């Protein structure tokens, strides 16, 4: 598997992702079942982005939702809103069968009942 992580890979243009994958592919043989994951922030999404990154080989997303609660997102200084998080996940489900969510539990005021 190849994992583009660190929180900001979704700032890369699809052509840049392709360039990196091509560079790695010159030195390593990829399995036909390779999993190529891209970490993304919800606020980096724009129409056509998922189709474009799939076209260059990304077949799994890891989405940095962090929380679906507005006040927690504000405490974390996240750029997206809770509604943005829900909207992006609806788009993710339309385009990817394989994805993960990064969620943060334990913010002040969090509790299991609420979650």
Q: What does each of the following model-derived ranges do?
A:
Residues 2-115:
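Conserved non-cysteine loop/helix-boundary elements of the Radical SAM core domain that shape
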């Amino acid at each position: 598997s190849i994992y583009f992580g660190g929180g900001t890979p979704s700032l890369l243009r699809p052509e840049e992702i392709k360039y990196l994958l091509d560079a790695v592919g010159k030195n390593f043989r990829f399995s036909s079942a390779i999993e190529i994951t891209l970490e993304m922030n919800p606020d980096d999404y724009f129409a056509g982005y998922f189709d474009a990154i799939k076209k260059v080989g990304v077949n799994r997303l890891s989405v940095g939702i962090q929380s679906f609660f507005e006040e927690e997102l504000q405490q974390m200084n996240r750029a997206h809103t809770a509604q943005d998080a829900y909207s992006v996940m609806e788009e993710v489900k339309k385009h990817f069968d394989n994805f993960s969510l990064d969620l943060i539990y334990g913010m002040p005021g969090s509790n299991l009942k609420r979650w």
